[in-house]
């Protein structure tokens, strides 16, 4: 069999899909000591199973600051866990952020998915088998930030921090068996800096990532921004019990934060 490649770069525009404001019942929940909740939107780049919304029980880390100090100043609230329920991110009593008593406005930084390790600087690992369960969406690191506000339910507009890789397969003959696709010799660890909103790969580019199904003959993975290694980084395709087919990139390519890269492989007999 022969494999040839067609590559396409797709710049991801952040298209906000804003949820409606809190219902009257939800507003009633927010009065008094109930604290802050959040509505949310996601940049539309097809890296999630649900592209334009969060899913029930999704969890995020939330940081709060007085004014615009951000991580350069003192944190008002550190890594509070908020959970998505009924179109809102809310928290339990221990984690709920309360408005300052001095009427200061708060600005917020939020990160998906939630982790106790999330901080101004932290390390994040994408899942190595993104075909399993929620591993694909749990690999989709996202960040949101707001201007100072005294709103009881501000909106978090999330953007995707990593690179989205899509592999489309075109077979000369229908595949005789199940198809699986791996990205090989890639980095799976991200060094994140929330203060500067920068995300870069760290560690050796010697890992493999099993991609998730993306529709007929299409597969996808979320990977750290990185520069592929010519003749090393590549795509491995397995059809049924046959020996894997391997394609190595003939030139280096820089995968950038928040951009989707689509590759089409033509597989002859």
Predicted regions and their residues:
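Sec-type signal peptide cleavage vicinity
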Residues: 2-5, 11-12, 19-269
